[in-house]
């Protein structure tokens, strides 16, 4: 999964002198899956509620950026569109204000995936717009990886594990 692929890539970077904190990362993530399981268990009731609420929505919008952009596409296109034949629209936080905001209207569920990297300011800008209520849409759902603690993990490593959290 992600852990092995990321560790492999980070080790290669380490060997080239580009990720000197590799050993520290490995030490701090050795038990990360116990925390991931806990996160999943805590989120499961919300996930079930969202699934029931939006299962029959005509289409759903997913917004993400940076380290979470791959997960945004994976869930929207691969899981919902290709596997479940659900109509979705995935958009980056940076592109949201270039027309997509006009598609936000009552009855259209919107999910904003907020990460912890340099794109967070863009995510916060989208959140501010969506939660102001100017579109009349009340189906705004924000999933912020910063809300899910991983004890013993340095903040510098959260950007690496935020896709794991979202998945």
Regions found by a protein language model. Give the residues of each.
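A SIS-like phosphosugar-recognition module
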Residues: 1-167
């Amino acid at each position: 999964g992600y852990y092995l692929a990321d560790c492999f890539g980070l080790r290669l970077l380490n060997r080239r002198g580009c990720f000197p904190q590799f050993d520290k990362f490995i030490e701090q993530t050795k038990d990360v899956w116990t925390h991931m399981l806990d996160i999943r268990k805590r989120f499961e009731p919300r996930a079930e509620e969202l699934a029931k609420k939006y299962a029959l929505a005509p289409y759903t919008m997913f917004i993400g950026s940076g380290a979470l952009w791959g997960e945004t596409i994976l869930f929207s296109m691969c899981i919902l569109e290709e596997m479940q034949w659900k109509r979705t629209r995935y958009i980056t936080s940076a592109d949201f204000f270039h027309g997509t905001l006009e598609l936000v209207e009552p009855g259209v569920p919107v999910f904003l995936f907020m990460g912890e990297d340099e794109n967070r300011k863009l995510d916060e800008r989208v959140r501010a717009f969506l939660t102001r209520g100017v579109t009349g849409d009340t189906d705004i759902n924000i999933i912020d990886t910063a809300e899910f603690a991983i004890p013993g993990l340095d903040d510098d490593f959260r950007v690496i594990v935020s896709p794991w959290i979202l998945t």
